[in-house]
Amino acid sequence: MNRLYPHPIIAREGWPIIGGGLALSLLVSICCGWWSLPFWVFTVFALQFFRDPAREIPLNPEAVLSPVDGRIVVVERARDPYRDVDALKISIFMNVFNVHSQKSPADCTVTKVVYNKGKFVNADLDKASTENERNAVLATTASGREITFVQVAGLVARRILCYTQAGAKLSRGERYGFIRFGSRVDMYLPVDAQAQVAIGDKVTGVSTVLARLPLTAPQTESEPESEPALQTAPVETAANPSAEQRQIEAAAAKIQAAVQDVLKD
């Protein structure tokens, strides 16, 4: 296990909100006493929501890690809409009490980032994957396998933040994005990946292994090479006489012609 923690325990995305809530709570406390209680509740909730603790990271090179905390809502064979290939799809739904920073599920190089505008339906629904605002990161793992992980906005979450771009190298567990206030992440893996979770399972970001992905793609069966055709000598037939036969026939024709000349004389 490896412990990766290159960021504060409270996500930077929450600093303005927490700072504002704290200042307002103190001000109302001084002026109005117990009337400040709702403001303190909001500030504590913001602290809880924007927490971003360090996690233990599995080092198995075949492990694909959960990029977020949450609950598994989809494990199925599906079509990766960004690569147009069959894939193993695993979706994680995050409620407002989960850690909402997104981290890389594997050591990989980002090849493309695709942003799509959309709606803000409940992220727990299947149609959220295709209808909601979303941001897809297409990447190639260190072993050359292609994976896709998609940030999907939700009913309350209306701000997707992505800090990576094409060409960037991400280490497993490295922070690359954030979605505020409830959302979803869809993972598309090669079809030979073996799911290690089931629908309903609770997962912990970068500590839970979602799937095992072989380092090399399965070999496709190649067609057997055809054997070279045997070269056979031409068959001698009446329509295809040999050179020796042609010589004999020519000599016989000459003799016959000579005999006919003698008879004429």
Swiss-Prot record:
Cofactor(s) essential for the protein: pyruvate
Keyword Transcription: no
Membrane topology label: Peripheral membrane protein
Modified residues (Pyruvic acid (Ser)): 183
Region described as Disordered: spans on this chain: 216-246
Residues at the active site: 183
Gene Ontology biological process terms, A to Z: phosphatidylethanolamine biosynthetic process
Assembly and oligomerization: Heterodimer of a large membrane-associated beta subunit and a small pyruvoyl-containing alpha subunit.
Family recorded in the similarity comment: Belongs to the phosphatidylserine decarboxylase family. PSD-A subfamily.
Function of the protein: Catalyzes the formation of phosphatidylethanolamine (PtdEtn) from phosphatidylserine (PtdSer).
Protein name: Phosphatidylserine decarboxylase proenzyme
Primary gene name: psd
